[in-house]
Amino acid sequence: MDKLLKKAFVAAAIKFPSALFGMFCIFSVLVILDITIPAAATSLMNFFQPALLFIQRWLPLFYVPSLVVLPLSVKDIPAASGVKICFITAGGWLASLCVAGFTAIAVRKMVKTEMTDAEPMAKPSPFSPLEIWAWSGVFLVSFVVALLYRTALGTAARTCLPFLLASTVLGYMVGSGLPSGVKKVFHPIICCALSADLAALAFGFLSQSGLDPVLGYYLTKVSSNPGAGDVLMGFLGPVILSFAFSMFKQRKLVKRHAAEIFTSVIVATLFSLYSTALVGRLVGLEPTLTVSIIPRCITVALALSIVSFFEGANSSLTAAVVVVTGLIGANFVQAVLDKLNFRDPIARGIATASSAHGLGTAALSAKEPEALPFCAIAYALTGIFGSLFCSVPAVRQSLLAIIG
């Protein structure tokens, strides 16, 4: 469905994210079925449940390609600009967290809606030793084949795809199994990216081709000659489509706490977009780089669609900044929420997801399951509203005017 919509939107020259349109369609169908034939809506949800669990289990993996090819993305960025981007990323995360959290608390005090139990959310199964051994076998065999026969699968990128994909998956599996104390410093995504980079470095050294060409094979951005990163990023569209099911499942919660959720998410999203543009101009960051990091708090799946609205944006930098924002949130969100005295699960969930999207959500919900439904809703809505705002020409022009 994602690919069909993408082709249709390209053919019609429509700039709006096709997956987001598909998400709205799925959500509408589920709502209509729930009103007219409730059993059909339940059957549809049950039918897609395995796919939703698959996405939930592997979601962080789909963010990794931008980190793996980061050495290529930052090559032409001056060191001074890199420092400014880091400042905006870290400071922006904290500011967005505060804005979303304080807005949620203020609205909660006004509406005084009592919390009720949310719909339980299924958890994916942990990785088994058999899976780790299977992927290890794929890595070893495909690595040797790629070394001996550089174009065994037609092109160098296709030939390198199996071992680069296997190294990425293995890194994620190993990282996911680390003790929670280690994960705070060495997040599974970092482990995952390092694993892929080490595999690329080893292949580049043994084949005498160097690291850069192998990283180029990892993410080619050419559909006819995909690399491992292209395969993983191909799941970003289905991730957006899956938002429809999570929002439908928590529809009663959304309806009950609509004031807190929608107000906080809209305010936080607008603040994130415009504050990034303003601070980028104040610190003298190049306009093309500022444009590239505007959707820093929005999930990669939609952040890439947002920067496609702007000319000259570096999409690889966009993805990297979004992932780094999520990693900052994953490592520090709980401590910062405690320091800010945010005790309400709704405020904690919304603040986390609005500032650090899926990675922050995963980190907080692992220890505070009561915040997970609000994280999941805010995570989806932040991306949706960010895309909707940036699809409006007047909003894009105002952002560009601020950037200069």
Model-predicted regions and their roles:
Residues Y218, S246-I261, L278-E286, S305-V321, ...:
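Helix-loop-helix hairpins and the membrane-proximal interhelical loops
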Residues W135, G171, P238-A244, P369-A371, ...:
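Membrane-embedded hairpin module used as a gating/binding unit in multi-pass transport
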